[in-house]
Amino acid sequence: MKDVLDARRTELVVEYNGKDITRSLADSLVDFTYNDAAPGSLDDIQLSLEDRLQNWQGPWSPSAGDTIKAEIRTFGWNYPEEEQKLPCGTFEVDSFDFGGPPDTVSIKAVSLPVDSGIRQEKRTKAWENVTLRTLAGDVARAAGLTLFYSADVDPSYERLEQTDQSDLGFLNEQAMKEGIAVKVSEGQLVLFDEAEYEKKDPALTLVRGEDAVASHKFGWSTAYTAYRACEVTYSDSTKNKTYQAMYVPPGAPAEGPVLKINEQVDSEAAAMRLAAKSLREKNKEAGKASLSLSGDVRMASGVTLLLQGWNRFDGKYLIESASHKVGSGGYTTDIEIRKVLGW
């Protein structure tokens, strides 16, 4: 095993505006971070570079919207002659910082086109007789993105009110109520059903004391006590009608706190759907943890894994976000995870 560890090597491959700058970057790289963000947040990459020759603060100085494509490659990571790749994607530069001494620069790029207004421009608009997929399609087109909708359900609405919100923020809000996650990746606006991802077989197993877990953090708090059920009640004064629904998940205890929601719905079915999805969203907070590992290209948002050896915290988890870092400390991966709900 020591020979394998000694032979380990990591390479960062970078294209800037379509030009391969891997070699010229190697001598000045301090560290590189790829954040595969949780749903609702943008993926990003960050480059920290030594700049004693003043190239990055001078002739190479980035401009907003410049494209950076990055890939992490590992060699001999688990056995001799093994090669693995983690394509991080293509990003657009949205910030640049320069400081010193010694002179260093930091370049950050995000997965959303920086000239798109869907993230920052606030709008007020009424959406009538619309489905979630149609709403997402409109937002995608406005940003120059392709819609990838991976969910069996496509909720419909008589009317939605967008009030002083960005298009992306409004879409995130509506999707979250339906238990559907939103991400922007590789020119796509992606919507997927988190519950379906939870059902997938674990992609890998981490065993305490056997796998390369450098540190771990688990815990619980009464502030995040799981609710046993959710009740939705809404009185529609225009129709003189009250909609009510109670959702109790399989295996719920006979006693415990009930989450109560008073939010606009237009049918009993919509009330039940809101109750189930709201309970999922709330109870996700009760089983969160974080792990720091030796670099692992398998770690990605949406992947399920099995933990063994952490006693009461053992079980199946979903990766919410993964941060991959390459630098003087080698290649490391940090993940934020939550226990799957199972319903």
Residue spans of the language-model regions?
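An acidic/polar, Gly/Ser/Thr-rich interaction patch typically located in mid-to-C-terminal regions
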Residues: F32-S63, D211-W343
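Short, compositionally biased
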Residues: E82-F98, K125, A195-E198, L318-Y331
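Amphipathic, non-transmembrane alpha-helical segments in extracytoplasmic/periplasmic proteins
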Residues: I45-S48, A109, R123-F148, Q162-S185, ...
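Solvent-exposed coil/turn segments that connect beta secondary-structure elements
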Residues: N17-K19, E50-R52, R73-F75, E92-P101, ...
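Assembly/oligomerization scaffold segments
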Residues: M1-V114
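Soluble periplasmic/extracytoplasmic beta-strand elements of cell-envelope proteins
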Residues: Q46-S48, K69-E71, T90-D94, S106-V110, ...
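Short beta-strand-centered interaction patches in the first periplasmic/extracellular domains
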Residues: K2, T104-I107, S111-D115, Y149-A214
